[in-house]
Amino acid sequence: MSSKRAPQQVASLVERLNRLGLLLRDESRGLDRSDLVLGAPCTHDSRQVLPGGAFVAIAGARADGATFAQEALRRGAVLLISEPAGVRLISTLGPEAVEVPLIAVSNARRALAEASAWWEGDPAEELAVIGVTGTDGKTTTATYLATALSAAGFSAGLISTALQRVGGGEEPVAAHQTTPEAPALQAQLRKIAAAGDRAAVLETTSHGLALDRVAAINYAAGIVTNFTSDHLDLHGTVEEYRKAKLLLVDRVRGSAASRAAHLEPLMVIRRADPSLAPFVAAAEAAGIRVVDFDVAEDGALLLDGQRHEVPLRMPGRINALNAAAALALVAAWKLPLDAAIAAVSAEPGPPGRSEAVDAGQPFKVIVDFAHTGPSLTAAIGVARSLLVAGGRLLLVTGAAGERDPGRRTAVGRAASAAEQIWIADEDPRDEDQDVIAASIRDAAGELLGASASERITVLHDRRAAIAAAISAAAPGDVVLLAGKGHERTIERGGVDEPWDEVAAAREALTSLGYPQGT
């Protein structure tokens, strides 16, 4: 929900959009009224319009938002914002739609971002906003960074897929949330600023960048964790996906708050990763300092070349890299590093990331959000580091429907590294679950050869698959439940079914006589 604000003069919004080159004045109407004010936020969802608010019509994949203008007006919208095609559509909806003041813009998504920031009073300018992007590791890195900054005396809010923090407290997140849409994002930044936090760590996805959700934010710094092919359902090609991620570099400009705190604009990028070379080049071309991070062979963290021994509660090299990225930023900003290291060492990590489920059983159960090929490979590496001699890795995995089909092949190939594999539903949405499972099975089977039929089981019922894997575990084994992590729903046929991966694991352990779940 947006914070309560005094009514705002629409003229100042018009001036802002004009200054940014978004306003199409000749196609706008009704903007000469001196009494035109907004008393409620802007939104692109007609169902969320409040009396006195504005409705931004965005052309979507299935419908043009302008078709919902009448509903927005019925709910009390006093201003419409639309691109020219939407303006023409609105003009056919009757006298009420024609008479309401309308701002025509060249880019409705960008206008939504700017209007949302304008309504909330540009909270990002009151904060040092750090964006964390990359294919995998964003949530853990963002969590480590918020923890590190706060411990170093620079209190930080957090907006991430699995966790939100405001003023030192934690808040629940929306189901399947990525980077929130601009109205919700700006409202959350206002909450963080109002709570007295000085920074906001924002998990910044390619969707958030490509769809202009973060277009009104001047970042103080950015972190790129890694880059591999993903989200081709949105971007089409790896090149377009990379271009979307590179937009973060363009947005690292510093805010009023970060400049006042003398925080140098930075990009934290691992130079040893060849896939990140374009990000290094873009940052250097923009005159932004690049801060390096890495992990030594013996596990020490390398913060821009400086070696630090940092014991972590989260196991595995991937989590060490995430911690190194976060601490490299703290060190580069010359904040108290010892305090930050101590806090990161104690950080258990976000829910659903290398999360252990312990009920006293003689084998380990790990819940992890890993849902791409590279992240599953990393999670399997972490799980294998926990095996005792002779132990087996038992894996439950899957892939989402209506998403990049290439992800399924990558997940299947990664899954082949497990001794036993159960392929279960993740979020089939409106896609045939058998088709999804077959893609994963076939990819794994190509690598497993003749043993595939013995090692792979397709069991769509995720609860049953988890129970089967845990029932099959012997002392010294590790059961890895991959793909859902922290998420609290399974999307199937337009319905969000309640789900809790950790609870499902505990239920299976209890049925085997291990009741003391933690």
Q: Model features per residue range: what roles?
A:
Residues 109-267, 278, 282-285:
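Phosphate-binding loop of NTP-binding sites
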Residues 74, 78-84, 267-271, 394-397, ...:
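Short internal beta-strands
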Residues 82-85, 204, 226, 271, ...:
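Short secondary-structure boundary segments
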Residues 52, 88-90, 219-365, 443-444, ...:
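Acidic, Mg2+-coordinating active-site environments of NTP-dependent enzymes
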Residues 53, 72, 115, 132, ...:
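Residue-level signal for inorganic ion chemistry
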Residues 1-25, 49-54, 64-67, 143, ...:
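ATP-dependent carboxylate-amine ligase
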Residues 81-89, 160-163, 271-275, 486:
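Short, polar loop motifs at secondary-structure junctions
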Residues 1-114, 247, 315, 335, ...:
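N-terminal leader/targeting and accessory segments in enzymes
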